[in-house]
UniProtKB/Swiss-Prot annotation:
Lineage, top ranks: Eukaryota, Metazoa, Chordata, Craniata, Vertebrata
Main location (coarse class): cytoplasm
Any single GO BP term: cellular response to muramyl dipeptide
Name the UniProt record assigns to this protein: Receptor-interacting serine/threonine-protein kinase 2
Family, per entry: Belongs to the protein kinase superfamily. TKL Ser/Thr protein kinase family.
Free-text note on domains in this protein's UniProt record: Contains an N-terminal kinase domain and a C-terminal caspase activation and recruitment domain (CARD) that mediates the recruitment of CARD-containing proteins.
Species: Bos taurus
Originating gene: RIPK2
Binding site residues for ATP: L24, S25, R26, G27, A28, S29, G30, T31, V32, K47
Coiled coil regions, renumbered to chain: none
Length: 540
């Protein structure tokens, strides 16, 4: 007998309204993506459950009830839930998008954030305590039980938004659905887990003190900007050490003497991670201790700290793009950089680039270095002596992406894409032509791609070493054709242009005419391309 469906007060958000879904991260609670709501015209975040087999109605309702509770927890320092996407093959919570990522990124990306001012660090600690204290004061109390720096998000002004609280059923379902233990960051969670929770029988008695232990670890991490137990790789070693009473060092090396209010903060840390749960303070007591500390900083210092971080972040993003551009010119000095996608034609013997100014053109040429030809992840494109190295890794600076054209054939359409076009100076690359086309046709592809076309796409990706075994299994083990196609398209968003081109080509090969017009691209197998190139060079 199926469970009664949950009558949710949460707004229902249809999947097709979540445009431009882009993978952000994956954790114990599911996969997080960014998206743009088609009607609201704002960026949102979507946390969706890892579903490998159909959920029972009772399981789905358990998850929806949790989401309903989270929706009621409205507070300044709690991540707002905007709605639920509840469809047969997709179950996700839609929240506000946090542009400054997580506290974990702020603390440990030291190149991006070389200095995190003390006023802001203490404000963050205070706001975490305010948020968890609010949850504990709900009726009944809402316990987080997975508090860690990855779940503390930061809005545009670096204010705290606590996420992933009250998702015990969600996490349980996600973990049971997951085929790989690696998808759950157990080591990371163990660091913040109190020792009494290593023994499941002890959980009920000590549950209200779980979050304060996690908070003590977070305080240490914020003050030191180090990973707790960073030298220990085995979670079992951490569990044994902590159960014996060991904790991260509070000596001068970890917590220097120049930390403001150092003695008070160490006292708060040590009481928070006490071995006996009954000796740990409540969050209310923590707030009483922290409020005088916050008053020692003038309001202007918080504003200055935020401006400093934003300025540093923008400068580093700009420098990254500049260095990438410089490196690209050094690697391929004769290949000009375009400002965006352009359509070109190639003639019988040489390739011309149409510049931004009408009536001007330049020949493209590139070295015949065989290292370029042997690169495993290249997106091979050329004419005669032109070859371009391409990597599927989005962090690598790609020179250029072009379609290959044989001078012995008729002129063909040639797309040149500049993957260095940054979105908002963020250093993220714009998707290529095939990726853009797939994103624009996403729902049409989901409804029209046949099982045969799907299988051919997976086989082609495997033969080109473009898909990892884990991703292949994740797609192939989905219960229905549409869920397999959705997972394939999600993977395409992550893997890049070469991956996308294979899918587009297979759709064309299978005569999926309802998806026309197709983009002008050409996918080549590696060996014919290489043979053609070598034959050309030998003939010369």
């Amino acid at each position: 007998m199926s469970a009664e469906p949950v009558c949710s007060a949460l707004p229902a958000i249809p999947y097709h309204k979540l445009a431009d879904l882009r993978y952000l991260s994956r954790g114990a609670s599911g996969t997080v993506s960014s998206a743009r709501h088609a009607d609201w015209r704002v960026q949102v975040a979507v946390k969706h459950l890892h579903i490998h087999s159909p959920l029972l109605d009772s399981e789905r309702n358990d998850v929806l009830r949790e989401a309903e509770i989270l929706h009621k927890a409205r507070f300044s320092y709690i991540l707002p839930i905007l709605g639920i996407c509840n469809e047969p093959e997709f179950l996700g919570i839609v929240t506000e998008y946090m542009p400054n990522g997580s506290l974990n990124e702020l603390l440990h990306r030291k190149i991006e954030y070389p200095d995190v001012p003390w006023p802001l660090r203490f404000r963050i600690l205070h706001e975490i305590a305010l948020g968890v204290n609010y949850l504990h004061n709900m009726n009944p109390p809402l316990l987080h039980h997975d508090l860690k720096t990855q779940n503390i998000l930061l809005d545009n002004e670096f204010h705290v938004k606590i996420a992933d609280f009250g998702l015990s059923k969600w996490r349980m379902m996600s973990l049971s659905q997951s085929r790989s233990s690696k998808s759950a960051p157990e080591g990371g969670t163990i660091v913040y887990m109190p020792p009494e929770n290593y023994e499941p029988g002890q959980k009920a008695r000590a549950s209200v003190k779980h979050d304060i232990y996690s908070y003590a670890i977070i305080i240490w991490e914020v003050l030191s900007r180090k990973q707790p137990f960073e030298d220990v790789t085995n979670p079992l070693q951490i569990m044994y050490s902590v159960s014996q009473g060991h904790r991260p060092d509070t000596n001068e090396e970890s917590l220097p003497f120049d930390i403001p209010h150092r003695a008070l903060m160490i006292s708060l840390i040590e009481s928070g991670w006490a071995q006996n749960p009954d000796e740990r303070p409540s969050f209310l007591k923590c707030l009483i201790e922290l409020e005088p500390v916050l008053r020692t900083f003038e309001e202007i210092t918080f504003l200055e700290a935020v401006i400093q971080l934003k300025k540093t972040k923008l400068q580093n993003a700009s420098r990254t793009v500049h260095l990438s551009d410089k490196k690209k010119r050094e690697l391929s000095p004769n290949i000009p950089v375009n400002s965006g996608p352009r359509e070109e034609s190639c003639g019988s013997s040489q390739l011309h680039k149409t510049s931004g100014s009408p009536g001007t053109s330049r020949s493209l040429s590139a070295p015949q270095d065989k290292d370029f030809l042997s690169a495993k992840t290249q997106d091979f494109s050329a004419l005669h002596q032109c070859s371009v190295n391409h990597s599927r890794n989005s962090d690598f600076c790609v020179d250029c992406q072009v379609a290959f054209c044989d001078h012995r054939t008729a002129p063909c359409s040639l797309a040149i894409v500049n993957p260095l076009s940054a979105e908002g100076n963020s250093g993220r690359f714009q998707p290529g032509i095939a990726q853009q086309w797939i994103q624009s046709k996403r729902e049409d592809i989901v409804s029209q791609m046949t099982e045969a076309c799907l299988n051919q796409s997976l086989d082609a990706l495997l033969s080109r070493d473009l898909i990892m075994k884990e991703d292949y299994e994740l797609i192939s083990t989905k219960p229905t054709r549409t869920s397999k196609v959705r997972q394939l398209l999600d993977t395409t968003d992550i893997q890049g242009e070469e991956f996308a081109r294979v899918i587009v080509q297979k759709l064309k090969d299978n005569k999926q005419m309802g998806l026309q017009p197709y983009p002008e691209i050409l996918v080549l197998s590696q060996s014919p391309s290489l043979n053609f190139f070598h034959n050309k060079s030998h003939k010369k």
